[in-house]
Amino acid sequence: MSLLSAIDTSAASVYQPAQLLNWVYLSLQDTHQASAFDAFRPEPTAGAAPPELAFGKGRPEQLGSPLHSSYLNSFFQLQRGEALSNSVYKGASPYGSLNNIADGLSSLTEHFSDLTLTSEARKPSKRPPPNYLCHLCFNKGHYIKDCPQARPKGEGLTPYQGKKRCFGEYKCPKCKRKWMSGNSWANMGQECIKCHINVYPHKQRPLEKPDGLDVSDQSKEHPQHLCEECKVLGYYCRRVQ
């Protein structure tokens, strides 16, 4: 029994609780087996060492006894179980836990999203046809959406935000009357002749076509009393040019 207590004390400092219980269970089994064999074991002679102290000093055939084999088997089982558990915990996942796996996936997602945004930002803009004229700056070489004078949608009162006179199309929101004018300006409207409300153009384009012709009819008289630009200036707005 002293050997069992010594084994339990030494094992408690080395093995985990689950392994310690397994060791105690195997030790109890070995104790019962040893008591069964002690009934048939001859009495030791005077001066001979006790069986516990003579452990490992016997003959080779004694080392192969059931008691020695049981202790060796239990020791090897514990070693094998410990190595197997370590390999399972170490090889369960390269990230170590589910949280690390989630963090790894999120970082990969951010990495690929950054690559996608970068590729879209570097995508070159399509070149317009040679005869295309931008409706904002009246220059060729780019579309209206790529114009350096373009403002965010909804910031201006009119589509055109430049300083030149342009051709505008109007539609009264009250009476649905439509008209066009060659004296359209940025952020300036014209009064509806029927409803007498100021209407801003919903479409504006340059006066000159690619062939150099004016799209407006210069022979028509401009109603200055309906033009907001003329009211602000105090004189005929076309005189600015």
From Swiss-Prot:
PROSITE patterns: ZF_CCHC. Keywords: Metal-binding, Phosphoprotein, Zinc, Zinc-finger. InterPro entries: ZAR1/RTP1-5-like_Znf-3CxxC (IPR027377), Zcchc24_Znf-3CxxC (IPR033446), Zn_knuckle_CX2CX3GHX4C (IPR025829), Znf_CCHC (IPR001878), Znf_CCHC_sf (IPR036875). A zinc finger (CCHC-type) spans 132-149. Pfam families: ZCCHC24_C, zf-CCHC_2, Zn_ribbon_3CxxC_2. Transmembrane segments: none annotated. GO terms for molecular function: nucleic acid binding; zinc ion binding. The modification Phosphoserine is found at residues 65, 93. SMART domains: zf-3CxxC. This is Zinc finger CCHC domain-containing protein 24. The lineage of its organism: Eukaryota, Metazoa, Chordata, Craniata, Vertebrata.
